[in-house]
Amino acid sequence: MPAPPRDPEQIREAHALRAAFAPFATLAELHAHADWPELARRLERLLACVRTAVPDAAAPARETSAGLRVVHWNIEHGNRFDAIAAALGAHAELREADVITLNEVDLGMARSGDRDVAGELANALGLHSVWAPLFLESTRGRDDDLLTAVGTDNTESLFGLAVLSRWPVTGARLVPLPGPEQTLFERERMTGRFVALVCTIAHPVTPFVTATVHLEVHRTRAHRAAQMRVLLDTLAHETGPVLLTGDWNTHTFDRGERHSVLAAAGPLLAWPGGALARRLLHPDAGPARELLFDALRAAGFEWAPYGDHAPTLGMRFSRLGEVHAMPGPLRALASRGLAWVERRSRLRLDWIAARGFDATGASGRTVPGLDGPGRASDHAPIVATLQLPPG
């Protein structure tokens, strides 16, 4: 069957909660209000809605001995849906994927055409799908979103994660993670929580688990590591192969602290280009490394066989809250220098890691030409070939 029908009651509740949250400038004010306990229960019910779908026409079966082709992509909400669908369906390096994990996936947002992005993509590709919400969006979008928005308001107003699979998904669960909800509410007008989506894939020879997680971007390396450790603790009991993907926001900087802007300015402005590139493209190594990789290694996960350390995102200072917080004259003065920094600041944020797979002959690649302004997404997709152990 195609994606489940849109639920009018869910849409009404989303609009009611958006209206209820709108008067509050801070999360503390919202939480202090007498209505918050009931609003929190309603929000929890809304965000517990996990959508699953079976395709109208399943993708052709593949030889079970063939390597597993895995694609991960942060699709920037699905704003440029047609370009994303075309790439996943026809691009030489992306088509015929066995598993596709997606971050930043809308349900009923004006910026992405008011679509069920995951459900429509999965049905077009002949794949099974699971989608889970992270946040209720209170606006029609930010930054470049309004360039692609349809003229009407949002419907469900939800934003989340998805797993698409050639084989049925026999179980899906959400793993709650610690997160900077205050920052997201006050800066981006999003209300919700961070979760990881964990799915059991019914491969005909060797069933395996696929998890995807979008880690936070506004805080420190330690905070991202704490999020990852919670997920890894949940996955520790899995005895079969585990695939773990996501936009882990491994930019190597500690944001949200008093001196974070100055601490970042030194490397971005003064380091030689080669040294800066090594830091930003190899965030799993060196003194500024993201601590989440230490946690992954301790939990038995590998990522080096499945990636190439190429950039997956170009830094865009126009989207950073720290830049918007500058006084106008200072921001104008800094703009020329920031443009220079953007050109040399390419980030490796997206990853495929695995435990319990045979890494012999594994490969990973970042797919060029699909990311950047006006293209399918702001992130590049990544693809890996893995070998399942015999059943």
Model-identified regions with their sequence ranges:
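Structured beta-strand-rich core segments of catalytic domains in phosphoester-bond hydrolases
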Residues: 3-62, 105-207
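Active-site environment of divalent metal-dependent phosphoester hydrolases
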Residues: 78-80, 107-110, 137-140, 182, ...
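Alpha-helical structural signal in soluble globular domains
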Residues: 91, 119-128, 234, 291, ...
